[in-house]
Amino acid sequence: MATKHEQILTYIDSLPVGEKISVRRIAKEMKVSEGTAYRAIKEAENKGFVSTIERVGTIRIEQKKKENIEKLTYAEVVNVIDGQVLGGRAGLHKTLNKFVIGAMELDAMMRYTAAGNLLIVGNRINAHRQALEAGAAVLVTGGFNTDDSIVQLADELELPILSTSYDTFTVAAMINRAIYDQLIKKEIVLVEDILTPADRTVYLSPKDKLEKWYEKNFETGHGRFPVVDDQMKIHGILTSKDIAGHDRNASIEKVMTKNPVTVIGKTSVASAAQMMVWEGIEVLPVTDGHQKLIGMISRQDVLKALQMIQKQPQVGEKLDDIVSRGFKDEGDDKEDQTVYEYEVTPQMTNQLGTISYGVFTTILTQAANRFLRSKKRGELVIESITIFFLKPVQMESVIEVKPRILEAGRKFGKMEVEVHSQGHIVSKAMLMVQLMERS
């Protein structure tokens, strides 16, 4: 039996796109307390089912597919620009294809404006009307308003007409930044991108006998199976270690590992990797946040995803990407120690003209990561780092980074990284890392 919380989420999901939602209405229709309704609406917002807009309320929106994440809805634009909705509220859930800045004569402006666009313009009433008639939404900058006839037309066509106090350039920059941030989010590989879905996952029931494990093991060749009830709620996990020494007629419920470590679909692959190393487990059940099984991931899935992340072309550039671009592999020095060369650019410095601590830490960790991969030791997750800053590093100076493995086990390792500039040692770091060896 689904909980009240899950029933409300299912109800919200079934509502048509553009429908207005309120705590009081949900509580009344679902016969629950307002607190329960509020919590469910908040979770729906986190999942992308609904969006809350100031002075408008909460509306049901279309959940974006990951491949279309670079496109924004008008509802998101309102939040990005701190704007207000003058008319056309029913169209806030629609997606904008591109935005057009109306800094030209009206006839020329309309040549660039098409359905699904957002026209950014000042207090030009004729431009507002023609844009709406062309199927485009309108964003009025400078805090200006529009005519009542335009608001009425926007309501009829279900095309939003928005207003913001910012100027045109600032608004365009803010929307551009929002799209760019979403492109970066697109690159972050999540567990939901690599999981084996529940309908393709082999699972057992707590009521089954251990004999069932042997049957599934023979059929699939796998040795680890999630244990779920009729509602797909996860109760445990059964592995070959659990069944050792037990009779085949014993109940799975008595033998299985209860309360297994689980992740949700929105967990990053990097977090899942760290969890698997720390707990020493080979598979992780993936749930919907309420212990309902939606799939499984294995250590092999995670390693493959981490390798894919390193090879894929970057769309939105992150700070780590900018730093890693400057590395040059200088081979080995006289003592057969691997050396990486790096030039400090002006963007990497602080107000004193020396290298920023954040950038410096990134250089050290990336050098350690590159070195481990070159030694075929797999991926690393840093547990702790101690840095000794001995001398300041000036802008445009070239530094030599020398990583070295002090000790490496199957799961953990210790590393030392020395940094030299102009023949002098400028920094030394000690790293404790978790290792995830390639199988």
UniProtKB/Swiss-Prot annotation:
Pfam families: 4HBT, CBS, DRTGG. It comes from the Bacteria. Keywords: CBS domain, Repeat. Residues 195-254, 256-314 form the CBS domain. Coiled coil: none annotated. This is Uncharacterized protein YtoI. The gene is ytoI.
